[in-house]
């Protein structure tokens, strides 16, 4: 798990902060938090990390895709219970799960894993 603390003025830079946070978590996981060297497949993944991501803008959401799977959705504008920049889990390839935000790319201060953003439950505990 990596904590993304940076705030962002624009959603695009917030998404880049999130992607870099996921990369840092991947490196930490692959090296046992610095106890071993980054080699083989893991090193190849880190070397081409930025090229594995696509950001696709839709009407309400921005879809963040890593390789062929949706990493998350980002809310484009305030709507109902969600704020601009909120990170939502994917319900499928085309739509987010609208149960709970997992953080906000504009305000920062959220937790992420290389497998996806974490969110807080009602007791403010981290959950995958």
Enumerate the predicted regions with their spans.
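Mixed-charge, Lys/Arg-enriched low-complexity segments
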Residues: 1-15, 95-128
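Amphipathic, interaction-prone secondary-structure segments
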Residues: 41-83
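Negatively charged, low-complexity tracts enriched in Asp/Glu with abundant Ser/Thr
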Residues: 1-55
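Hydrophobic transmembrane signal anchors and adjacent membrane-proximal interface regions, especially
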Residues: 4, 36-40, 83, 88, ...
């Amino acid at each position: 798990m990596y904590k993304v603390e940076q705030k962002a003025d624009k959603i695009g830079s917030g998404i880049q902060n999130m992607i870099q946070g996921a990369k840092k978590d991947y490196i930490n996981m692959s090296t046992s938090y610095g106890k071993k060297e980054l080699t083989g497949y893991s090193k190849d993944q880190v070397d081409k990390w930025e090229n594995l991501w696509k950001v696709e803008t839709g009407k309400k959401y921005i879809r963040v895709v890593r390789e062929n799977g949706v990493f998350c959705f980002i809310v484009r504008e305030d709507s109902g219970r969600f704020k601009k920049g909120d990170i939502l889990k994917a319900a499928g390839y085309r739509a987010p799960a609208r149960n709970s935000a997992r953080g906000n790319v504009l305000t920062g201060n959220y937790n992420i894993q290389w497998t996806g953003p974490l969110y807080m439950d009602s007791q403010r505990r981290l959950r995958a």
